[in-house]
Amino acid sequence: GTSHWNNALVTSTNKSSAKDFEFTNALINKLTVNYNIDSLRIYACGFSNGADFVFALACYNSDKIAAIGAVSGLMYQETIDNCDPLHPTAIIEFHGTSDFIRPYDGISEYYASVEDMLNHWTSFNHTSKDPLTNSITDNGTLIEYYAYHDGDNGTRVEHYKVVEGDHVWFDLSYEGANTSQLIWNFVSKYDLNGLR
């Protein structure tokens, strides 16, 4: 097989037996003991399968993860069905409408659509149902921005919809910040208790 993050629970129906949730917990525990890190401010970020994994971390390792950033990733429907984090979780997510690996509309009974993921997190976090919106064109690419705000503990769910965007880490500029900067600027506002 190929290397990947196992973003599903280890069960008889999961083709992977890698215990990546346990590995991540052990890694965080080791880093917390050996380095001076703030255990209330641990964030996860990923692309593609890594983004799928950080969504799952927000569900299954929520005792450690304060906020996540996901690029071109989706949640398994099974993950949504079993997702019960210990606290409201701030989410920033980027996805292209022409993504052929993680389709924007999901894959029936396998990957949830971006809309279903947003509905899950906005419902769980009790955010506004009507997002703040904006749109810009960056180098000929239309970017639609949706911010679901006023969630429990100050959480937000932010979605950057890249119209005709592919399965990539987006090289975009939104209000002077690139994708990596947007993620850091967002997640760093949070700790395990919510908005700092």
Specify the residue positions occupied by each region the protein language model found.
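Serine-hydrolase catalytic machinery in alpha/beta-hydrolase-like enzymes
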Residues: 1-43, 53-56, 60, 82, ...
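Sec-exported extracytoplasmic/periplasmic mature domains
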Residues: 29-36, 58-66, 119-126, 188-192
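Short beta-strand immediately N-terminal to the catalytic nucleophile in serine-hydrolase-like folds
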Residues: 44-46, 71
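Active-site loop->helix "elbow" adjoining a glycine-rich segment at hydrolase catalytic centers
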Residues: 48-51
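The feature captures the conserved acid-bearing segment of alpha/beta-hydrolase catalytic domains
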Residues: 66-153
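Conserved beta-strand scaffold positions in the cores of enzyme catalytic domains, especially
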Residues: 145, 159-161
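Histidine-bearing beta->alpha loop at or near hydrolase active sites
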Residues: 164-168
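Catalytic active-site module of serine/aspartate enzymes centered on a nucleophile-bearing elbow/loop
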Residues: 175-196
